[in-house]
């Protein structure tokens, strides 16, 4: 299914770690043929570069690396190791790092008028204006369920880590995201809450689709159609 109307559709998906927002963004993007941008991958890629190259001056190094970065390239990398997870939360607190990645995100958004942006501050800082999102979702999940999902993903990558360690790691990451000074994890006033621990994938996509199509009908009236 895709949009007959060529007008913009910008969807923001925010939420805590392992809340299901990445899965939701991928499924909705596939259904409506939207470009899907995962901001978490950008920060994880930055962490991977720093861990690997150990630059003396991080900001000039990252600015150069992100200048001509091909987003599709990083989607093919394994960026979900626990080492990167432990590093990325502290990197994401840095204002100048966030500015570099924000510039890259804005460039991608200008290139794709029909896009789904997923992360922790997409509605509040990235798609908040010029341009603004058409609809925003905020994902929540029971901490135990989120930790178990994350632990299963790590096990498939042969990561040696216990479920309790994953649970503690997610707790710390979410606390850092909420409390950080620049672009903290917050729910925008008009975001629609999606509780993924109470929905399977099909039900989640159905709920999101109803909200998206309701919003598009209000925006475009009877000229709105999907194909």
Briefly describe each language-model feature range.
Residues 29-39, 52-55:
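Post-Walker A helix-loop "phosphate-sensing" segment adjacent to the P-loop in P-loop NTPases
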Residues 16-19:
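ATP-binding Walker
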Residues 22:
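Walker A/P-loop
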Residues 41-117, 121-126, 144-148, 164, ...:
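ATP-dependent small-molecule kinase phosphotransfer cores
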Residues 115, 133-138, 191-193:
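Short, well-ordered beta-strand core segments
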Residues 11-13:
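Hydrophobic anchor at the beta1->P-loop junction of P-loop NTPases
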Residues 2-6, 79, 103, 151-156, ...:
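NTP-dependent small-molecule kinase module
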């Amino acid at each position: 299914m895709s949009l007959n109307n060529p007008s913009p559709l910008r969807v923001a998906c925010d939420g805590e770690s392992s809340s299901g927002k990445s899965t939701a963004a991928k499924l909705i993007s596939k259904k409506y043929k939207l470009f899907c941008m995962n901001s978490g991958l950008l920060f994880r890629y930055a962490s991977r570069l720093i861990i690997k190259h150990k630059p003396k001056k991080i900001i000039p190094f990252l600015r150069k690396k992100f200048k001509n970065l091909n987003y599709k390239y990083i989607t093919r990398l394994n960026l979900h190791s626990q080492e990167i997870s432990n590093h990325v939360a502290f990197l994401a607190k840095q204002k100048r790092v966030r500015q570099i990645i924000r510039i890259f995100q804005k460039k991608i958004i200008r290139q794709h008028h029909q896009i789904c942006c997923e992360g922790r501050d997409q509605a509040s800082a990235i798609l908040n204006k010029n341009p603004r999102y058409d609809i925003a979702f905020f994902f929540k999940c029971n901490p135990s369920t989120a930790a178990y999902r994350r632990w299963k993903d790590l096990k498939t990558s042969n990561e040696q880590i216990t479920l309790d360690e994953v649970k503690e790691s997610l707790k710390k990451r979410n606390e850092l995201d909420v409390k950080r000074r620049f672009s903290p994890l917050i729910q925008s006033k008009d975001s629609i809450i999606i509780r993924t621990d109470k929905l399977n994938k099909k039900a989640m996509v159905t709920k999101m689709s109803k909200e998206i199509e309701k919003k598009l009908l209000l925006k475009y009236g009877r000229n709105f159609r999907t194909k």
